């Protein structure tokens, strides 16, 4: 069964691309009776405020017609930022060699949070170098991942 994020991704991706942007990812977070639906968009050269506004208007119209969210919600549209979240295998592959953080669904070695250099991806496993040691994680066990920006 597909998640709400997966359903929204499928529903909205084409419209976002028609506006010249990539739908980087979607997060849905519940807070009490309300939900926040957060869309991350990206494009070559960077995302502008006008891009976010255009995507927000387009997506709002689609969600009003399709009505896929049963609860009241707030829609947020933004760029992924420097510490961008990673949602897909392809996105992880773009950042091999860079520092990332991962939050696991099921702890490994009594830890849920890990940070290290993304060394490689093989199949559905990614390997980080953490404190000069290799640690491998199943993509299915990663709840959240972010790029650690270099300054």
Curated annotation (Swiss-Prot):
Q: State if Transit peptide is listed as a keyword.
A: no
Task: Fetch the Gene3D superfamilies from UniProt.
Answer: Ribosome maturation factor RimP, C-terminal domain, RimP-like superfamily, N-terminal
- Source domain of life is Bacteria
Write out the entry's keywords from A to Z. Answer: Cytoplasm, Ribosome biogenesis
**Which Pfam families does the record match to this protein?**
DUF150_C, RimP_N
UniProt-annotated location(s):
Cytoplasm
Q: Name the principal localization, coarsely classed.
A: cytoplasm
Q: Which GO terms describe its cellular component?
A: cytosol
Q: GO:BP terms for this protein?
A: ribosomal small subunit assembly; translation
Protein family (similarity comment):
Belongs to the RimP family.
PANTHER family per the UniProt record, alphabetical? RIBOSOME MATURATION FACTOR RIMP (PTHR33867:SF1)
What is this protein's function? Required for maturation of 30S ribosomal subunits.
Name-wise, this protein is Ribosome maturation factor RimP
Q: Which organism is it from?
A: Mannheimia succiniciproducens (strain KCTC 0769BP / MBEL55E)
């Amino acid at each position: 069964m597909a998640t709400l994020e997966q359903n929204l991704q499928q529903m909205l991706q084409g419209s976002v691309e028609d506006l010249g942007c990539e739908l980087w990812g979607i997060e849905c977070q519940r807070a009490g009776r309300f939900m926040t639906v957060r869309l991350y968009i990206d494009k070559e050269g960077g995302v502008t405020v006008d891009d976010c506004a255009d995507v927000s208007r387009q997506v709002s119209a689609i969600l009003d017609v399709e009505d896929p969210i049963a609860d009241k919600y707030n829609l947020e549209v933004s760029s992924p930022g420097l510490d961008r979240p990673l949602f897909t295998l392809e996105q992880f592959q773009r950042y091999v060699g860079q520092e990332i953080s991962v939050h696991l669904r099921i702890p490994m070695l009594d830890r849920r949070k890990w940070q290290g250099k993304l060394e490689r991806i093989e199949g559905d496993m990614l390997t980080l170098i953490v404190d000069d040691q290799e640690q491998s994680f199943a993509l299915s066990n990663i709840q959240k991942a972010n790029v650690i920006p270099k300054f």
